[in-house]
């Protein structure tokens, strides 16, 4: 047992050394999220990728196959199978760079989607799953020659918790997974690292101070300032129910079934559960920083041009989801003052097999110093330093620049491509974004039009040829219709909000949950 714990700690330490920073050796004055934990959190977050439209489409197809009533026995069997197979998020990593963000669809598991999307390019990749993959996925992934498979140590993809799993099929699948694991070259493991000291506190403080929350408080100064904390508590409850096993004995039983019996004894078990809870708290905190807040979202300031496909906004829940991806990336920053994250997605001409629908991942990045540099190679001072020669601004690579540099897909001019940035793009990045052919920018607008000592944000407001969607109240006047006929904008079209969504027990701000 002691050796097992030492091996786990050794594996965690190795992973920490290999992915601690972009530069490989730099340790800043602020806490940073390790790459292992970043990939883990992104896999959990991808499991939550909005799929309402896909479910509606599936329901219509189901009625088309079986008629309005359908074959009850067949529909019951399909429903039972789907309850047993848990939706799963997946992050594909190559050379410590993200090359794919995926989630399960109605028809395919996350691992199967990765095989379809990446094929033989999966060789030597690391895969981070939000649940332990099933044998059907694992056999193909292992066959592709992946390097390492990491998973979240709770209920696996073939659920061991649901009533549907009582047929023993889930246990048989777990045994098959263990046999595949034992006889493959790929390292199948749990990579969870304890968060660095003060990381949770730092994330809480910076999330509340981020552009999106501050825009709400400045726009509505009389509003209840507790809305952010109320939203966070709701998210924590939701994510703990989804990603944790509340009953400790049941959790131990699952761990033993999926081959992690070495983690069932203390202190390993208690440490594991604490690390999992800390990561869920961090995810809920970051997700709450881009809240599903009534009448706030990413809108064009001049919404009159919404006819062309490149000018149409994404559904708000998808835009928020992608912005939270960027917010998570920002906690890998090497800038002591301001963390910025950016993620690029594109939308194909038709829906694909992925749970993300027609959307596919292009690239991502955060602000950092050049790859391979050491901590003392470049200045780290901001504009408070009078000597301009030892300021950081001429040396740091911006998040948008890293996302463009390390993109894994080409940006196609005929498709709608979009970049999500946690802060307004500066004058250095705006022409790069336009020149790359990106059609849409989603960002905060707190700094628009400002000119600071070493960085300015003048070009964003003047940018033409790229649709800009900034975090703001719906400019079409939906907020003023609150007492009459509430509406919300989706894909550039105002749609009525169901009456039941309007009820909110004496709260000045209403927040929703994904």
UniProtKB/Swiss-Prot annotation:
Compositional bias, Polar residues, is annotated for 1-11, 18-27
Query: What are the protein's GO molecular function terms?
Result: cytidine deaminase activity; dCMP deaminase activity; importin-alpha family protein binding; protein homodimerization activity; zinc ion binding
The subcellular location is:
Cytoplasm; Nucleus
Tell me what this protein is called.
Answer: Cytidine and dCMP deaminase domain-containing protein 1
- Which residue pairs form cystines in this protein? none
Name any Gene Ontology BP term: cytidine deamination
The enzyme's E.C. designation: 3.5.4.5
Which family does the UniProt entry place this protein in? Belongs to the cytidine and deoxycytidylate deaminase family.
Protein species of origin: Homo sapiens (Human)
Q: Does the keyword Protein biosynthesis apply?
A: no
Which cofactors, by name? Zn(2+)
Recorded catalytic reaction(s): these are: 2'-deoxycytidine + H2O + H(+) = 2'-deoxyuridine + NH4(+); cytidine + H2O + H(+) = uridine + NH4(+)
Stretches for region Disordered: 1-27, 55-83, 480-514
Q: Which InterPro entries match?
A: APOBEC/CMP_deaminase_Zn-bd, CMP_dCMP_dom, Cytidine_deaminase-like, dCMP_deaminase-rel, Deoxycytidylate_deaminase_dom
Q: In which tissues is it expressed?
A: Widely expressed. Expressed at high levels in the testis.
Per the record, where are the segments of Basic and acidic residues compositional bias? 59-83, 485-514
Entry keyword annotation includes Hydrolase: yes
* Annotated binding of Zn(2+) 1, by residue: 109, 134, 137
Active site per UniProt = 400
């Amino acid at each position: 047992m002691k050796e097992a714990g030492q091996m786990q700690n050794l594996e965690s330490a190795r992973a920490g050394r290999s992915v601690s920073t972009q530069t490989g050796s730099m340790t800043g004055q602020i806490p940073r999220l390790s790459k292992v934990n970043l990939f883990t959190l992104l896999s959990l977050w991808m499991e939550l990728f909005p799929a309402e439209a896909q479910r509606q489409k599936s329901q219509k197809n189901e009625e088309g196959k079986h008629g309005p009533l359908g074959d009850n026995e067949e529909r019951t069997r399909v429903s039972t199978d789907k309850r047993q197979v848990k939706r799963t998020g997946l992050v594909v990593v190559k050379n410590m760079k993200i090359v794919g963000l995926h989630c399960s669809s109605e028809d395919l598991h996350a691992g199967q989607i990765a095989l379809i999307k990446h094929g033989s390019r999966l060789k030597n990749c690391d895969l981070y799953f939000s649940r332990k993959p099933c044998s059907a996925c694992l056999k193909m992934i292992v066959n592709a020659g992946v390097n390492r498979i990491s998973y979240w140590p709770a209920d696996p993809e073939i659920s061991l918790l649901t009533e549907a799993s009582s047929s023993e099929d889930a246990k048989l699948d777990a045994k098959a997974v263990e046999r595949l694991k034992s006889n493959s070259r790929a390292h199948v493991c749990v990579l969870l690292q304890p968060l660095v000291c003060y990381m949770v506190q730092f994330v809480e403080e910076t999330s509340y101070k981020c552009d999106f929350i501050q825009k709400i408080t400045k726009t509505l100064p009389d509003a209840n300032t507790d809305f952010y904390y109320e939203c966070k508590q709701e998210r924590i409850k939701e994510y703990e129910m989804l990603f944790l096993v509340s009953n400790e004995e049941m959790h131990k039983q699952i761990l033993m079934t999926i081959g992690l019996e070495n983690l069932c004894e203390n202190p390993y078990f208690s440490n594991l559960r604490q690390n999992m809870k800390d990561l869920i708290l961090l995810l809920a905190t970051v997700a709450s920083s881009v809240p599903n807040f009534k009448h706030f979202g990413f809108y064009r300031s001049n919404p009159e041009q919404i006819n062309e496909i490149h000018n149409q906004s994404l559904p708000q829940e998808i835009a928020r989801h992608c912005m939270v991806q960027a917010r998570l990336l920002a906690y890998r920053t090497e800038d002591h003052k301001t963390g910025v994250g950016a993620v690029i997605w594109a939308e194909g001409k038709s829906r694909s097999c992925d749970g993300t629908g027609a959307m596919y991942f292009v690239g991502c990045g955060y602000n950092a110093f050049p790859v391979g540099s050491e901590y003392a190679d470049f200045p780290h001072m901001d504009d408070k330093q009078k000597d301009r020669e030892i300021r950081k601004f001429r040396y740091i690579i911006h998040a948008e620049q890293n996302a463009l540099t390390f993109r894994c897909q080409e940006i196609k001019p005929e498709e709608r491509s979009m970049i999500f940035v946690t802060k307004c793009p500066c004058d250095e990045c705006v022409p790069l974004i336009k020149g790359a052919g990106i059609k849409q920018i989603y960002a905060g607008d707190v700094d628009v039009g400002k000119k600071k000592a070493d960085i300015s944000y003048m070009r964003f407001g003047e940018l033409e040829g790229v649709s800009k969607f900034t975090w703001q109240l719906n400019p079409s006047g939906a907020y003023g219709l609150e007492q009459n006929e509430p509406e919300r904008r989706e894909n550039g079209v105002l749609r009525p909000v169901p009456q039941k969504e309007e009820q909110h027990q004496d709260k000045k701000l209403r927040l929703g949950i994904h």
